[in-house]
């Protein structure tokens, strides 16, 4: 069964005759197809009875919460056989990006390590005599802004989105 969600017309208000098709070459656990640089079909490689967790959670957030910090589910394909259902694919808007979260984290960690390596030992003196938890609580105001630079704002935004996600998931 192929179906559109209530979000379909909002997500794709115009012509949905997609003729340009390309496969994403990224290493991931699913196969993804991009349509006219507007839509993404995520094909689940592991097919099991019941909904795929990625599909089920994304669909719930799209249809039952106000959480907007993820690509909404516009449709899907389910296989129904012998009274059992399995999710095969999900349709979402295609959101181009300059990279992925894992690479961002690796780059940030490398930059942090390089900055720490270049700092003289005197930079650590404000933490002398502090227990680990007190130092961790004080670190953001003493050193984090200088060492993390713009990444600190990205980490704060990630934390805020994660908190919003958990609130949305708990809202049911």
Which stretches of residues belong to each language-model region?
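Conserved ATP-binding subdomain of kinase catalytic cores across diverse folds
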Residues: 1-172
